[in-house]
Design a protein with these regions (language model features):
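Small-residue-enriched flexible segments
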Residues: 1-127, 131-142, 150-182
Length: 182
């Protein structure tokens, strides 16, 4: 369910719906709670401010048992909404496909070059299947598009499929920039 960020400072989340954030995560994760923060990439936070048309994902960087707080890879504004997430590989591959299709619908139908920036968190989760996200992008663009890219620790881009030009720092996403001759 959607929750309200009731207490935060910069990138530290103290409370969701008036409850300690870490306690709520522990209830949500059950047996997986011992895996935090080492398995943090599997349990990110979907975050959206009042000004955003579409939310973004925030990765857990650490937890503080003493304060019941959690540190994320990006600021979290009080009064915003949040949703606890669980990642799976098929959704990551599907997200890469959606990103490639969004590029084509936003510009040239046959770009000559695509630069792919994929979060290192995606690589950690996907392990041996990491090539699947590149294969699906290659399939969407076709052989005329040369692909290059790198793994990053944060992707700066507008939110997908929106006309909102505002850029945000994203975590655990794939961002694609294409170039075409006109």
């Amino acid at each position: 369910p959607e929750r309200k960020i009731t207490r935060s400072k910069d990138n530290i989340l103290y409370e969701l719906d008036g409850e300690p954030a870490l306690g709520l995560y522990k209830k949500y994760l059950g047996d997986h709670v011992q895996d935090l923060p080492t398995q943090c990439f599997y349990f990110p936070l979907y975050y959206q401010t009042k000004d955003m048309k579409k939310g973004i994902v925030r990765t857990i960087l650490g937890v503080d048992e003493k304060t019941g707080s959690m540190t994320f890879a990006g600021d979290l504004e009080e009064g915003s909404t949040a949703r606890l997430m669980k990642t799976n590989i098929d959704n990551l591959v599907s997200g890469a496909e959606d990103a490639a299709k969004a590029c084509l619908s936003a510009g040239a139908s046959s770009p000559g070059l695509a630069i792919i920036m994929s979060c290192v968190g995606r690589k950690i989760i996907m392990k041996q299947r990491v090539e699947e996200e590149i294969e699906v992008v290659e399939e969407i663009f076709g052989p005329q598009t040369h692909l290059t890219g790198f793994y990053s620790y944060g992707e700066i881009a507008p939110s997908k499929n929106t006309l909102d030009p505002t850029i945000h720092l994203h975590n655990q996403t794939i961002s694609i920039t294409t170039f075409a001759e006109i």
